[in-house]
């Protein structure tokens, strides 16, 4: 191995190890909330659950993932779930889910907008479909806080004119 490669490896390895330790999917069941927050930092949101607490780590608006870390009543990690995928988005129940349920499952949206033909907000989430196909989920929430419609579109390419993200 050349001297340059050894120097590169010496600097790169610690960076890779730090990056891996800050990934929610690398956490082991049973970890305490304090250990989780020491590793990942403060969550972007905290939600009460019937059986414990959900710590939410969102990569929105720039990223395409939201990790839900569910803790039991004793504050121990039970489950890590990357919730922004088509399977979970398609579980949204039109005319039943509320703004709070969307927030608890998917966190804060990347964008909140209003459109002319809908009386309410449109929450837009960035997510990836299999094989890294970038998509947007537009969740229409009326003024009473009820989900009325979900529309899926392709995310504009970075070089598209007028790209908002």
Question: What spans do the regions from the language model cover?
Answer:
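Bacterial N-terminal signal peptides that target proteins for export
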Residues: 1-12
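Residues within mature, well-folded domains
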Residues: 21-165
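C-terminal motif of bacterial Sec signal peptides marking the signal peptidase cleavage site
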Residues: 16-19
């Amino acid at each position: 191995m050349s001297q340059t490669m050894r120097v590169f490896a010496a600097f790169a390895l610690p960076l890779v190890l730090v990056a891996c330790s800050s990934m929610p999917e690398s956490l082991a069941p049973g970890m305490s909330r304090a250990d989780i927050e020491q590793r990942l930092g403060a969550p972007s949101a905290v939600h009460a659950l019937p059986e414990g607490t959900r710590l939410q780590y969102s990569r929105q608006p720039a990223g395409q993932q939201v990790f839900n870390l569910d803790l039991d009543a004793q504050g121990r990690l039970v489950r890590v779930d990357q919730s922004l995928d088509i399977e979970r988005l398609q579980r949204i129940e039109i005319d039943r889910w509320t703004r709070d349920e969307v927030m608890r499952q998917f966190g804060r949206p990347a964008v909140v907008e209003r459109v002319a033909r809908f009386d309410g907000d449109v929450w837009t989430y960035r997510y990836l479909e299999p094989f890294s196909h970038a998509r947007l989920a537009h969740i229409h929430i009326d003024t009473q806080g009820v989900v009325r419609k979900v529309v899926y579109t392709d995310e504009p390419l970075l070089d598209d004119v007028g790209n908002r993200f």
